[in-house]
Amino acid sequence: MPKFDVSKSDLERLIGRSFSIEEWEDLVLYAKCELDDVWEENGKVYFKLDSKDTNRPDLWSAEGVARQIKWALGIEKGLPKYEVKKSNVTVYVDEKLKDIRPYGVYAIVEGLRLDEDSLSQMIQLQEKIALTFGRRRREVAIGIFDFDKIKPPIYYKAAEKTEKFAPLGYKEEMTLEEILEKHEKGREYGHLIKDKQFYPLLIDSEGNVLSMPPIINSEFTGRVTTDTKNVFIDVTGWKLEKVMLALNVMVTALAERGGKIRSVRVVYKDFEIETPDLTPKEFEVELDYIRKLSGLELNDGEIKELLEKMMYEVEISRGRAKLKYPAFRDDIMHARDILEDVLIAYGYNNIEPEEPKLAVQGRGDPFKDFEDAIRDLMVGFGLQEVMTFNLTNKEVQFKKMNIPEEEIVEIANPISQRWSALRKWILPSLMEFLSNNTHEEYPQRIFEVGLATLIDESRETKTVSEPKLAVALAGTGYTFTNAKEILDALMRHLGFEYEIEEVEHGSFIPGRAGKIIVNGRDIGIIGEVHPQVLENWNIEVPVVAFEIFLRPLYRH
């Protein structure tokens, strides 16, 4: 979880009130933080705050914490208002960056009065967002510049590796390639762009370099001090919605210091946008849902008051609350998220504890017993069980399996691209297991009983997790018949008749793959794995496999 340092006096200046250390321990809970440490330095008291929410970068600075506490205490209420005026500054984005670092969004904040506290908070927030929310600058990197040294228009371009500028902290110029090799930040983050034909570069109309995203700012414009009055902010990354959110967090934090936000026109080849966009977001929730899950007897007015403490604009009609919330938040995905804010505003310490009353006795899930029986059968057939991860990625699920990419459930903020989606089928996981064990003796006969996650628009969560069985046999001489023998034995033990209908599937050899039909329903696939798939996984022996849904075979 993100940890960050703040000055007690700076927080109190932003809120307009003073508090004791004991009071601060409770107050920071409103901002989903805990007071991790307190120390004194040069006559000032500092806090180390431990944020308990990785989806709320707006709460990772003194400005964000102070803002939330002001609302929680009723000093302010409702939706925060931020005025954004156009600056008439334009940034042109090079089309050649689409496979390098495609998106950049920008803003100007004027009229700042920076001191050591506010400057350190700005830099700390920039770094925390890039490190945590931005996945060590892979997804989001932020640059802050002295706008008075910049001559618009500005160009975000794909540059030759031989271009030169003086990076931050250096007086002499270096080529972009040299920066990756010699500069501390180049060595730390160079892997993000090193294999690209061109490198990203942000320059102004006079050719002055602002930065080399996501590596380093220039010495000329990238050094911001307490004398800086007007700043230009750039945020680059791979997903437009993520860089937009990061920009919104930065500019609204500076607006809490009295900065005036100015928007920038950003021109891409196929579209253009004005950033930042601080249009409030909207959500609706049933008030009875909040009452039921919270266990609190709250009337409509009380719920409205609690939500206003959490920076919502609330309109209640016919048992529903229509909500508007700030554009620096992107964590509202379900009514439970609204409920959480209601409980934070109410105060968890104010909820009376109740002893749970269990009216029933627990017992095992019959379907889990069925899954265990399937496992026992597979072991009895001479197979070894493996347990692989539900998390995967599109390359494993589709490209390496020689099939077209389909829509699957993806992770919004993956810690790694390797674990960026939920698997749609299990066989790719078994192929990866076989690929990692080519040094072991053959034959290798493995199976897994596990979950596959599918998109289902009819469900509340738009997804459904289905239990499946996947079997893979690897070794010299294995054919379709060997896989079918195991399937025959399984169906016989379960008391089902089945048919196999020939099917074309990129993961299997043409003419040696089929759909598995039970009671007229397609429940899976069986076949000999295609040579291209074996090559993709560096497997040098034949593999035969099948995968089936288990629920159609379950009898209560």
Swiss-Prot record:
Tetramer of two alpha and two beta subunits. This is Phenylalanine--tRNA ligase beta subunit. Residues 278-353 form the B5 domain. Its cofactor is Mg(2+). Belongs to the phenylalanyl-tRNA synthetase beta subunit family. Type 2 subfamily. GO terms for biological process: phenylalanyl-tRNA aminoacylation. The keyword Protein biosynthesis applies. It catalyses: tRNA(Phe) + L-phenylalanine + ATP = L-phenylalanyl-tRNA(Phe) + AMP + diphosphate + H(+). The keyword Cytoplasm applies. Signal peptide: none annotated. GO terms for cellular component: phenylalanine-tRNA ligase complex. Mg(2+) binds at D331, D337, E340, D341.
